[in-house]
Amino acid sequence: MPVQPCSLPAGFLPAAVSLPSQQTVIAEDETGKATIYHDAPLPIPEPHMVLVKTIAVSINPCDWKMPSRFPAPGARIGCDFAGIVLSIGPEAARIRRDLRIGDRVCGGIHGSNPIDLPSGSFSQYVAAHADLLLKLPNKLSFAQGAVLGGSVFATLWIALYESLGLEGTPDMPLQDDPPPVLVYGGSTSTGTAALQILRLSGYRPIATCSPHNNDLVRAAGAEKVFDYRSETCAADIKSYTNGRLRHVLDIITDLQSQLICYDTFSRVGGKYTCLEQPAEELHLRRTVRKEMIVGLAASGKEIALADGYERTANPQLRARSGEFFQTIQRLVDEGKFVPHPTRTVEGGFEGILKCLDILKSGGTSGEKLVVFLDRENP
């Protein structure tokens, strides 16, 4: 029996191509294991969304950590993607007048979502928030677009500005006596993005990484790089910053990173922002204010996780995040923001499963894994 085409909700601009009713996706099975399914329905986009044909995806640590920690049978996995706009919702057309059917875009969505099972980028088609999309300039490939994605920028808006409370932005950088900001995990994709944004915002970014990634991290904007494996790492950072360090972003958030980050502060203390739940027993210094942020909250929707990762709906945060994406779009268009280095893994959906295993085993350093789901558009 032939597959019946998919129908879009009322008000959507007609799709550029005929849409099937089923697609291939990677979703969680009953135990949370990433599994390939070939008979999944297409997502039904909301009025403020666009429907995107996925060309390439990048793989993040959260793509294996979330199903492992918060299994949600049936939830589709994956956050970051690059693809082609197929249809635009009526509200999306109003808030993004620059978007056109056929545009090359990238973005991020909430994969492994227990209250929105069809949301996940490891799919042939995704429904994405229009105001959290970036248009890809011709000089950037789909692989680079998948690495840009959207989850990094959502995370960094919340981390740098909502949590750390930094005042300088790429639109209005600091002019006088810029303070240092430490990025622990500078060679990660989030790290190189943070360093570029900090530099463009007028700060003095410093970072930790493995020595073989020093050139990458310096190129991203770090004025000084420290070896996190050195026994004197924290002392070296404290000495270099002359006790002026007040803002630390810990991208790694393991026991070692937390110990080092806390020891970089002087007695005056400061703000420590991390991306995973920190160890409570470490946080005995009252002068250091800690906060664990969840980048997914930039969508403005409820984050129905647990163990401190849950968040209530926050439309105002969504609006501020959307404004930040406009800033990032300008930087990308002007060539002022450089995507993280890519490593393409072949195999389509099977390649994604391979990448998840690579990340679990710690098999990447200074690069982002990318898989193409449509090789006709490399």
Curated annotation (Swiss-Prot):
Functional pathway: Secondary metabolite biosynthesis
Induction data: Expression is positively regulated by the oxaleimides biosynthesis cluster-specific transcription factor poxB.
Magnesium in keyword set: no
The keyword Glycosyltransferase appears for this protein: no
Residue numbers binding substrate: S151, V152, F153, A154, T155, L156, W157, I158, G295, L296, A297, A298, S299
Entry GO MF terms: nucleotide binding; oxidoreductase activity, acting on NAD(P)H
Annotated signal sequence range: none
E.C. number: 1.-.-.-
Binding residues for NADP(+): 62-65, 187-190, 210-213, 228, 275-276, 364-365
Keywords from the UniProt entry: NADP, Nucleotide-binding, Oxidoreductase
Pfam families for the chain: ADH_N
Family indicated by similarity: Belongs to the zinc-containing alcohol dehydrogenase family.
Subunit note: Monomer.
Role summary: Trans-enoyl reductase; part of the gene cluster that mediates the biosynthesis of oxaleimides, cytotoxic compounds containing an unusual disubstituted succinimide moiety. The first step of the pathway is provided by the HR-PKS poxF that serves in a new mode of collaborative biosynthesis with the PKS-NRPS poxE, by providing the olefin containing amino acid substrate via the synthesis of an ACP-bound dec-4-enoate.
Protein name: Trans-enoyl reductase poxP
Protein species of origin: Penicillium oxalicum (strain 114-2 / CGMCC 5302) (Penicillium decumbens)
